[in-house]
Amino acid sequence: MALLHSGRVLSGMAAAFHPGLAAAASARASSWWTHVEMGPPDPILGVTEAFKRDTNSKKMNLGVGAYRDDNGKPYVLPSVRKAEAQIAGKNLDKEYLPIGGLADFCKASAELALGENSEVLKSGRFVTVQTISGTGALRVGASFLQRFFKFSRDVFLPKPSWGNHTPIFRDAGMQLQGYRYYDPKTCGFDFSGALEDISKIPEQSVLLLHACAHNPTGVDPRPEQWKEMAAVVKKKNLFAFFDMAYQGFASGDGDKDAWAVRHFIEQGINVCLCQSYAKNMGLYGERVGAFTVVCKDAEEAKRVESQLKILIRPLYSNPPLNGARIAATILTSPDLRKQWLQEVKGMADRIISMRTQLVSNLKKEGSSHNWQHITDQIGMFCFTGLKPEQVERLTKEFSVYMTKDGRISVAGVTSGNVGYLAHAIHQVTK
């Protein structure tokens, strides 16, 4: 104790004789980060936190974009469990993957998206790299554009678009613009507005398109509308950047959900494409995705692949192994693939059924509003058309949680709570 005491005394004496030492000590005590402001909470995660604090036994969380079964529980696909068992039985190692990811997974992902008989695949004029789910695919794609797309820095997003699109492209150094997409008057697709805006986009700009199950609106163009949009994209020489996070999950048919991507390619439009297996395989936490660039020829594809690897190396070196093995096992095994496609259709059909039941229950409640847009929309999300003040009432009076824009995750609706939800919506809209 004496030594400690004498140390403090000597330290104090040194500071007294040398004021600079005291100033230095004070500077060390202060933080480097006093200028950092508190960031805003994530709007969707904020909904979940509020939901968790609610003690109402009838509470509903319709904010989170994750599939739930008809009991409201997280759902692990049986095909995923079988694939995991097969992988475990092989006693495989845990070595690093190559920078571009698991080769079998990349090949199978390209086939799933473009079709097994795609001319692009047969000619080898494409490159697919494994990414950290769809978000990682978008960031890799955005970084590639920033470095090599020399024609424009502008990326045109539909209004609205997935909330993460803006920070992903902005943080990669791209500039964000918008084009009309959703019509709040009809709760449907503003086709004439979208076509007019796209036709006015400067040539050689980047156009982001949701391949299916548009997030957050659930509003998709019809095939004939996609055809007209593709014609304008080709005429204006725009670069089509597709985000396909829900293949198979939208309609229950993977080929149907990939129709727009395949049509653009058939029209001679060389696209890039982001894929995610979070929703259609339920591999949320495994972070499994892919980024594909369709090129002029195989030689160009090799050059693009080399630069994608150079971009990926300082970002995360190489992607995760386990989820890619699961997805590749399912996609390359005929029996597992067949089972998986049936399970995906089952999930999609349940969501479609919940949309129908919600509208039916709203009619039973006596609602005089037209709710057809709920069944017209597709995929996990639905833009209800509810106003912010109505959303607030739903939360306060009925413990029904959703984002302020009125978007609900239909996956959170079950046969056990759809009647309660319809009653709550009717009460705040009548």
Curated annotation (Swiss-Prot):
Residue positions, PTM N6-(pyridoxal phosphate)lysine: 279
Transit peptide: 1-29
Tissue specificity annotation: Expressed in all tissues tested: liver, pancreas, kidney, heart, spleen, arterioles, and lymphocytes.
GO cellular component, one term: cell surface
Leftover remarks: In eukaryotes there are cytoplasmic, mitochondrial and chloroplastic isozymes.
PTM annotation (3'-nitrotyrosine): residues: 96
Name of the molecule in the record: Aspartate aminotransferase, mitochondrial
Domain of life where this protein originates: Eukaryota
UniProt: substrate binding residues: 65, 162, 215, 407
Sequence similarity: Belongs to the class-I pyridoxal-phosphate-dependent aminotransferase family.
Modification type Phosphoserine: residues: 143
Residue numbers of Phosphothreonine PTMs: 48
Subcellular location, record wording: Mitochondrion matrix; Cell membrane
UniProt cross-references to SUPFAM superfamilies, sorted A to Z: PLP-dependent transferases
Cofactor requirement: pyridoxal 5'-phosphate
EC number: 2.6.1.1, 2.6.1.7
Modified positions (Phosphotyrosine) in chain numbering: 96
A matching Pfam family: Aminotran_1_2
Role of this protein: Catalyzes the irreversible transamination of the L-tryptophan metabolite L-kynurenine to form kynurenic acid (KA). As a member of the malate-aspartate shuttle, it has a key role in the intracellular NAD(H) redox balance. Is important for metabolite exchange between mitochondria and cytosol, and for amino acid metabolism. Facilitates cellular uptake of long-chain free fatty acids.
